[in-house]
Amino acid sequence: MSKKSITIITAFIILAALSRLLPHATNFTPIGAIALFGAAYFSDKKWALIVPLSALWISDLLLNNIMYSSLYDGFAWLSSGFIYTYGAFAMVVVLGYYLLKKVTAGRVLGGAIGASVLFYLICNFGVWVSSPMYPITAEGLISCYVAAIPFFHYTLAGNII
């Protein structure tokens, strides 16, 4: 892969991540698409993971310390549920790396749906296990997933578009 291609792909991923700073519906961001794109177009697995995760972290730094600074005591390097968000994101990169070895419309659509489902399941599990909002029971987990359903279609749309 040429240096020019790497630069273009990296710039595209960073711009997509920074789009999270624009006003949007909750979860209507290209987070899964960024991971899938990186996985599909970086031939080196290391960069397919590092560049999208770094772009996510940079946009999180800006969001947490500018837009949501009132929610934190001091400078926030990471959000409280980062392990679940970044873990889901990393799993989407792995999904994309294997699913998008050959890029076709069907595989991209399948990847976008798979990315959305992975993100939904992992991140909402994180909400359930790490916050006092839900009891740590099967009913609490189900309640958490049900409460998150209204946000799922925005995640899916953000990944597809």
Task: Describe the predicted segments one by one.
Residues 19-27, 54-94:
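Interfacial aromatic-anchored transmembrane helix boundaries in multi-pass membrane proteins
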Residues 98, 102-161:
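Membrane-embedded alpha-helical hairpins and interfacial helices in multi-pass inner-membrane proteins
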Residues 12, 48-59, 108-116:
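Central hydrophobic cores of alpha-helical transmembrane segments
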Residues 16, 40, 56, 60, ...:
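Alpha-helical transmembrane segments of multi-pass membrane proteins
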Residues 10, 25-42, 62, 82-91, ...:
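Membrane-embedded alpha-helical segments of multi-pass membrane proteins
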Residues 1-5, 25-26, 70-71, 101-104, ...:
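Helix-boundary and loop/linker segments of multi-pass membrane transporters
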Residues 1-42, 46-51:
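Hydrophobic transmembrane alpha-helices
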Residues 41-50, 61-69, 121-124:
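Juxtamembrane membrane-interface segments at transmembrane alpha-helix termini
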